[in-house]
Amino acid sequence: MAAPLLHTRLPGDAAASSSAVKTLGASRTGISNMRALENDFFSSPPRKTVRFGGTVTEVLLKYKKGETNDFELLKNQLLDPDIKDDQIISWLLEFRSSVMYLTKDFEQLISIILRLPWLKSQTVVEEYLAFLANLVSAQTVFLRPCLGMIASHFVPPRVIIKEGDVDVSDSDDEDDNLPANFDTCHRALQIIARYVPSTPWFLMPILVEKFPFVRKSERTLECYVHNLLRISVYFPTLRHEILELIIEKLLKLDVNASRQDIEDAEETATQTCGGTDSTEGLFNMDEDEETEHETKAGPERLDQMVHPVAECLDILMSLVLSYMKDVCYVDGQVDNGKTKDLYRDLINIFDKLLLSTHASCHVQFFMFYLCSFKLGFAEAFLEHLWKKLQDPSNPAIIRQAAGNYIGSFLARAKFIPLITVRSCLDLLVNWLHIYLNNQDSGTKAFCDVALHGPFYSACQAVFYTFVFRHKQLLSGNLKEGLRYLQSLNFEWIVMSQLNPLKICLPSVVNFFAAITNKYQLVFCYTIIERNNRQMLPVIRSTAGGDSVQTCTNPLDTFFPFDPCVLKRSKKFIDPIYQVWEDMSAEELQEFKKPMRKEIVEDEDDDFLKGEVPQNDTVIGITPSSFDAHFRSPSSSVGSPPVLYMQPSPL
């Protein structure tokens, strides 16, 4: 029986759909009626058999004998751009009765038939589907061309206007029948699969090959991805490969649209065009017409991204997130079995593509969103990352990335309860203590990222999580909360010879120092000052001569769940996302007190003064400055040459 098709979001619709996986609607022939109709076509005799002095069969047999005149006439008739529906139907009926003669010798003829404009009247569609079924069942050599033809219809047709040899217009055809045409193509795939069970195996390479170039229009990419996701529903064996293909393409977009570039584009557009697309108005001479257009499309335009790559990425990301919800939710409730299956697919893709990708900003949010469906999946994700981090057989870059993900996930996932946060902190801190114990008598017990990268990454995950969650950890019974934090023994970590305060991102270190200082958990400022004095400048050659720089990110820090700035995707993420909580006026005053010029060597005195050292590496501790300085650095010193590090041309 044909599987149901997916309706996540109709390409071109303004609003993102939250519909579940639905069966074929009344707009299409029902499954049982479809089969009955197919059987009628398969058994019906040709209505017209005479062409050019004989049947198609006779023409084909003559061609094999070397008589090509009738064959050439046949091809010319099929290539007629003004061919009528009745003519198409008549030819298809004859070809069905001659399908046994359509061997590989007639590959050119089949290619012409596959280019016929068959997505027209319902009668033409039904006859064409019957022909495809007969052809692939009798001549499997033509299975790939048939599948390729169908896949080529998963994007809007192009409208090309020429003046001489020059294309003056090349755009998507806004055909109202496009959704129905997509439905028909999916139906065609299912019919073919019924006669050739190996269809999915042959289909996947074709879907990869037909994936539009990422510089194609957003609508073209949206339609193709939409149709790939629908295929994954009725060909579930292809789901993993389809999702991997989509996410791989999203990554190529993501690494070419940094968060900073996106925000800069939005800010520039707001300043210059009052928040509208900066390209609009350049060719609109009629102000009244422009105003009317804006009024009609106002809600849609509010979701548009100014940055063109971000706009495409946002559309596709929201489509994937909507698909995930459609798959996992049944009647408004999470289906554990379906969600578990999807989690297995996505965690494998995450390991293969995301964990080794340094420059992605948004694609990884598919894991964030999936984990929000049920706590068990969030805990499974954390356990998976933990195993990656503490496994010495993994490359250091993978272990460090796992640490980055743990810290960012614990800090930003609003759906993770405090008990899970505490359990993860216990696990991380205990591992750090064991690591330090093992270094005490070793020859490598000194500060070096190359030697202890995973250790520093775990330290930063702890510091980062603590900064975000300290209010929750101390809420309720303050004395009990302090007792718990004291049991973590931050002092041993901070005072160790490995000196994590020197390696971790300065913004993280300074917030950690300020908060632990306030609650007398550990006193960091003397170490910070000593580290600052020991920080050696690095001389780098530039186009304008040598320049002196200080490496402020030796750990190559990356916070994968920094705030999402894609407008459509944010609607999925914001309800489950932990933003930085504003500090009270009293806290601000305490944290912002300037330190005296003299370096305070006594940490007890430093704590009593409640001061934060003011130097080049310390940021202002205000709610407005937090997210800006606490994000992944826009560029990192010593970044490893991992996948997608260098933006590739789209």
Swiss-Prot record:
One Gene Ontology BP term is: transcription initiation at RNA polymerase I promoter
**Phosphoserine-modified residues are where?**
S169, S171, S639
GO function terms (MF aspect): RNA polymerase I core binding; RNA polymerase I general transcription initiation factor activity
**Residues that bear Phosphothreonine:** T199
Does the record carry Membrane as a key word?
Answer: no
PTM section of the record: Phosphorylated at Thr-199 by MAPK9/JNK2, which abrogates initiation complex formation.
Mainly resides where? nucleus
Keywords assigned by UniProt, alphabetized: Nucleus, Phosphoprotein, Transcription, Transcription regulation
What is this protein called in UniProt?
RNA polymerase I-specific transcription initiation factor RRN3
